[in-house]
Design a protein with these regions (language model features):
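Glyoxalase I/VOC metalloenzyme domain signal
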Residues: 1-171
Length: 171
């Protein structure tokens, strides 16, 4: 149940999961909100890190084309851009970039050899934010095993314990 203005209503959704024995990078869950008016409420979407949405998910695989084939089985409502070092899949809501290990390390070269890549994995999550103010306060004192890179357009965190890069871009 969701309570809005003192009135309880039932939020409804459907989920589909793809287990990690099929998609080697990890588990994937899709959630279709059947009552979006009870979920996507502006006052519930704000956070002190000012993140408004997920811009991109990167997946690392020794064969990015095989991942593309799996995505094509899930939906045909996508735009595909194949380049030499990355395959980009765009939906109405998100961008998924498929890399091999070498190309991913090149994109995130600021972290050098600190990136510990597996053959198949989720590599990074790019989030849109309206301000870097809160993010600039985060440092290695706050989080164990964290590396940070910043320029005028983005702030990147390598969370070594989770083997994941969080990238924040300003909108």
């Amino acid at each position: 149940p969701v309570e809005i203005n003192g009135i309880k209503r039932e939020a409804k959704f459907e989920t589909v999961s793809i287990k990690d024995n099929i998609f080697k990078a990890g588990r994937v869950y899709f959630c279709n909100h059947l009552t979006p008016n009870l979920v996507w409420i502006p006052e519930y979407k704000s956070h002190k890190n000012n993140v408004s949405e997920i811009a991109e998910i990167t997946v690392i695989d020794c064969s990015p084309l095989s991942i593309l084939k799996m995505i094509n089985k899930i939906t045909d409502n996508i735009q595909i851009d194949k380049q030499e070092d990355v395959i980009t899949v765009k939906t109405d809501d998100i961008k998924i970039s498929l890399y091999d290990k070498r190309s991913f390390k090149e994109r995130y070269k600021n972290f050098g050899e600190e990136i510990n890549l597996r053959k198949e994995m989720f590599g990074s999550l790019t989030l849109k934010t309206s301000s870097f103010l809160f993010l600039r306060k985060i440092n290695q004192i706050n989080f164990h095993n964290l590396l940070k890179f910043e320029d005028e357009n983005k702030i990147q965190f390598l969370l070594k314990d989770y083997n994941l890069i969080l990238e924040f871009i300003k909108i």
